[in-house]
Design a protein with these regions (language model features):
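RNA pseudouridine synthases
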Residues: 1-296
Length: 296
């Protein structure tokens, strides 16, 4: 008796093309799914064109072509209130982390993303473990990459700044920002109490550059997009405080302004060249609804 593995079994919904278009454009017009989810289905080899898997975004479709879209996904067996799998292949996994969970084990806390993913890999009979290549603070939410083998981990770590070409965060900061956009650059260094502080001149720390763009504002708060040119510890939180508009809910660098009872920082865009296939990988999550609600 052959037992079907729910991890690999796929079922498809079938469509017929009625007007010529590039594949991604056609999928976005005909599937009631977000752009990130459609791209993930493509990259997960969940789309078939004329009975063969297609991953090319600009694959040309002609009138009469048959398109099959997978209805089941590898992460159907995955359930976690803290972690959402956005994309997965044999080399890596992209997840969206909730607040309240560490990126990896630290101290006596057993709740961390690596442990959650390792448990998922065991349940789905994958012979791999999650390898940490970058981190988000416990109370920062958003997109992260985990490698599934040591070789992919090393490729990502050794060439991180060339592989990852766009990382953007969104934050609710205290007060009304004076400028619509700009750049802040200085040196960041930890003191003996592990508090990161900045200096306009070289203080022996690491040079940090953050670009910002205001998306919305009220007298009380501003919704700000941050794009990292460097990725230093606590960079956005320190730079926000330097501008006089700390991230809301920031106990360490904030001013007590805590309208949502959480650190209002979310990693919402992550774009990189796949370390093995070299394909451009672009992921974007919605700005948290609770952030948007403050500006209605």
């Amino acid at each position: 008796m052959i037992r079907k593995n729910p991890y690999t079994e796929e079922k498809y919904k079938h469509y017929k093309v009625t007007a010529p278009a590039p594949l991604l454009e056609w999928l976005l017009a005909n599937l009631n799914e977000s752009k990130s989810k459609v791209k993930a289905t493509l990259q997960n080899r969940g789309i078939k064109g004329e009975c063969k898997c297609v991953t090319q975004f600009d694959y040309p479709l002609n009138v009469g072509d048959k398109i099959s879209v997978s209805k089941s996904k590898k992460n159907d067996l995955f359930r976690s209130r803290y972690v959402k799998i956005v994309y997965e292949d044999r080399f890596l996994v992209v997840i969206e982390k909730n607040i309240g969970i560490l990126s990896m084990a630290a101290g006596h806390s057993s709740l961390n993303v690596k442990t959650v993913l390792d448990d998922y890999f065991r349940k789905t009979k994958q012979k791999c473990t999650a390898h940490v290549v970058h981190r988000l603070d416990r109370d920062t939410s958003g997109l992260m990459i985990y490698a599934k083998d040591i070789q992919t981990e090393q490729l990502l770590e050794h060439d991180w700044h060339n592989i990852v070409y766009d990382r953007r965060y969104v934050a609710v900061v205290s007060g009304e920002m004076e400028h619509d956009e700009g750049t802040i650059a200085n040196w960041l260094k930890d003191n003996k109490s592990y508090v990161t502080y900045s200096s306009p001149v070289d203080n022996g720390g690491k040079y940090a550059v953050t670009h910002f763009h205001v998306l919305d504002r009220t007298v009380a708060h501003s919704l700000v997009e941050y794009q990292l040119e460097t990725g230093r510890k606590n960079q956005i939180r320190v730079h926000s405080a330097d501008m006089g508009h700390p991230v809301c809910g920031d106990i360490k660098y904030g001013n007590g302004d805590d309208p949502l009872h959480r650190l209002c920082l979310h990693a919402y865009v992550l774009c990189f060249h796949h370390p093995v296939t070299h394909q451009r990988m672009e992921f974007e999550t919605p700005i948290p609804a609770v952030f948007r609600h403050l500006f209605k």
